Amino acid sequence: MEIRAAEISKVIKDQIANFGTDATVTEIGSVLSVGDGIARVHGLDNVQAGEMVEFANGVKGMALNLEADNVGIVIFGSDAAIKEGDQVKRTGTIVDVPVGKGLLGRVVDGLGNPIDGKGPIKADKRMRVEVKAPGIIPRTSVHEPVQTGLKALDALVPVGRGQRELIIGDRQTGKTAVAIDTFINQKAANAGDDESKKLYCIYVAVGQKRSTVAQIVRQLEENGAMEYSIVVAATASEPAPLQFLAPYTGCTMGEFFRDNGMHAVIVYDDLSKQAVAYRQMSLLLRRPPGREAYPGDVFYLHSRLLERAAKMNSDNGSGSLTALPIIETQAGDVSAYIPTNVISITDGQIFLETNLFNAGIRPAINVGLSVSRVGSAAQTKAMKKVSGSIKLELAQYREMEAFAQFGSDLDASTQKLLGRGARLTQLLKQPQFQPMPFEEQTASIFAGTNGYLDTVATTDVSRYEAAMLAYLRSDHPQVLAAIRDSKDLGDDTKKALVAALDAFAKIFA
């Protein structure tokens, strides 16, 4: 075989001339120590705070502590396969997640990866998990109602689009049930084509049991609500960093709707567990502890999340993101650190009480302590007209109830007040998964506040309400339609409703 030097030199010259200069340069560090989901890494001198990094085995992490000689990284996965000396490389990207309508009907983890076995997600784009909340100028005041379908809420503690309304109570008081009923109640609005009426739903499960999350997904599917909902699940068995990140992930998905002129409601279930996960991470990163061993910035953890819920003005698309954060109290103690923090951040709170729940008053809302700081601005005109007096009557009832326990001989007016209060309390009860359209709520509360229940036995109130609404649907559908279409209780509609209720009173027995 003859060696042709000229040919070989030509090939070498061609190789040199066509050599690709686009070599990829990645900054690589090495693990100094690892344990409890935290890695200390040396050599990542230019890493950004909040940047994603990748370990040798493919597990991702996020740089949280930038110190003089090393970087504290929280690991989004198991640290079992990571050992001292392993390589860690920068990705150059801040944590981002897929967003868009392609996520509706799906269950994803804290990083937006699908965990429901329905294949990859068709996302419109990816957005950063940590962004600044909208400023003051792009916002407008809350003025459109979120119809929860729960009489006690829509009448007494109204929630508006763009509001932050805290749901707070002990374990097993029905906090999640309030949120799920709100989701189910959006079915009729989301079935239409009017994008301004639709309300997309996002449920973020933080530190919940997997069985609980599976049950919630099943309930949403059975009630036809999953098709317009997204579930973000960082369950109790997930690492603390994912439980910390999940609410921000869900919020980013909700912001896609808010910033594109659509409306969304997001439930964080619950932020107590997120704070616990963040406390765990902070202590392991050796940040100084404060009250109840939470780090000093635990208020900022929740405020920067909840400030992203907003109602945008018409120049910015008129979209909205409504937040319903949930906080679990211990033995009804709302003066603990995290509950007081979140109460001060939100625009009102819904108190759920164990003794009301056990007494059969469900939803177990303490009407006296619950408040909406947006108030009647978030109600339809019809609901505003009928619910004004119910608040006063229930307040008087609660005040009198305390005195009535001492004295037996009460005058007629006090007895009447106590009787009506007891009937109104019965009227506000509602079974789970049965949200009520607002026109039917209006008719119910109108009947309660205008004396139609005064002759009905307290035990028969629920039966009266069901029969009365069935009668209106069958014999007077035009009354309900008028309330639904005008969202008001005009004089003509009111006369027709009074006539219908008078006619029903004669046949109810």
Curated annotation (Swiss-Prot):
Q: What is this protein called?
A: ATP synthase subunit alpha
Assembly notes: F-type ATPases have 2 components, CF(1) - the catalytic core - and CF(0) - the membrane proton channel. CF(1) has five subunits: alpha(3), beta(3), gamma(1), delta(1), epsilon(1). CF(0) has three main subunits: a(1), b(2) and c(9-12). The alpha and beta chains form an alternating ring which encloses part of the gamma chain. CF(1) is attached to CF(0) by a central stalk formed by the gamma and epsilon chains, while a peripheral stalk is formed by the delta and b chains.
Q: Does the keyword Amino-acid biosynthesis apply?
A: no
Q: What class of enzyme is it?
A: translocase
Per its record, the protein catalyses: ATP + H2O + 4 H(+)(in) = ADP + phosphate + 5 H(+)(out)
Q: Where in the cell is it found?
A: Cell inner membrane
Can the keyword Cell inner membrane be found in this entry's annotation? yes
The record's section on PROSITE patterns has: ATPASE_ALPHA_BETA
Q: Which Pfam families match?
A: ATP-synt_ab (PF00006), ATP-synt_ab_C (PF00306), ATP-synt_ab_N (PF02874)
Q: What does this protein do?
A: Produces ATP from ADP in the presence of a proton gradient across the membrane. The alpha chain is a regulatory subunit.
